[in-house]
Design a protein with these regions (language model features):
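A conserved beta-strand/loop capping segment in the N-terminal third of enzymes
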Residues: 1-41
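A short, flexible beta-alpha/helix-coil linker loop
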Residues: 2, 131-133, 195-198
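Short, solvent-exposed loop/turn segments at secondary-structure boundaries
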Residues: 6-7, 136-139, 201-204
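Predominantly flavin-linked oxidoreductase catalytic cores and closely associated redox partners
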Residues: 24-160, 171-179
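Short FAD-binding loop at a beta-strand-to-alpha-helix junction that anchors the flavin cofactor
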Residues: 116, 121-123, 183-201
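A conserved FAD-binding loop/helix module that cradles the flavin
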Residues: 194-215
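C-terminal helical "tail/cap" subdomain of flavin- and related membrane-associated enzymes
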Residues: 214-222
């Protein structure tokens, strides 16, 4: 079964996002590679002992494993290739589920698909994605499966520019209120994945992060 979607598809590379933020934000607002030691409703203490005072603190960290949540995992490896000649793929392939439907670990059945994004006439981004109950990522096997897929669709071997990988939680049930109460601090607002601001199926957070950032910048008393 094939279906062509007549809609726009937007994608943002980590490299471009990082570059734009560094160029746009004042240098004094950037704190890179810095770990937070502690925080409360009006301050954040960094690992090096520096204390940042603030009118408000928002916890936007990643989601954490909890006995209060139920679900599985979205597991993926993505690879960005450059080819010696144009690849000929004009539109994104959003979800090719014609690939084998199994997880690498234990050879269990799992919902798996490949997606392909044409980033330039001679560049493609491939991602091998599957949903599984086990939190296990075999990077080398997924890398190999992407190489196989390249051959299957008739492409010559390309040069890998970059690679990414991830294991994202897919929450299907549980007691979210109990989950939040297990770590939230009085007076500290919650956002990001830890606060549940993520898509229920993909676990992606970017659209929610943008909406929250605009709302905070536009209305908060900073």
């Amino acid at each position: 079964y094939k279906r062509k979607m007549h809609a726009n598809y937007c994608s943002l590379s980590s490299k471009d996002f990082d570059k734009t933020l560094r160029e746009t934000l004042p240098l004094e607002t950037q704190s890179l590679g810095t770990r937070v030691k502690n925080f409360d409703s009006s301050s954040v203490t960094l690992a090096d002992g520096e204390r940042l005072e603030a009118g408000a603190v928002i916890d936007c960290r990643n989601i954490i494993a909890s006995k209060h949540l139920e679900g599985g995992w979205q597991i993926f490896v993505g690879r960005h290739f450059k080819y010696k000649k144009p690849h000929g793929i004009k539109n994104p392939i959003i979800m090719d589920a014609s690939v084998t439907q199994h997880a690498p670990s234990g050879n269990r059945s799992a919902y798996r698909f490949m997606y392909v994004l044409p980033l330039a006439d001679d560049e493609l981004f491939f991602e091998d994605t599957y949903y599984d109950e086990e939190r296990a990522l075999d990077e080398n096997l997924l890398k190999y499966r992407i190489d196989q897929y390249n051959q299957q669709i008739g492409l010559e071997e390309g040069t890998e520019i970059s690679r990414e990988k991830g294991i994202l939680p897919v929450i299907t049930g549980g007691d979210f209120k109990a989950y939040l109460s297990s770590f939230e601090k009085q007076g500290v607002a919650m956002a990001g994945a830890r606060g549940g601001f993520n898509h229920p199926l993909t676990s992606f957070t970017m659209p929610f992060a943008v909406s929250n950032a605009l709302a905070i910048a536009g209305k908060a008393n900073l």
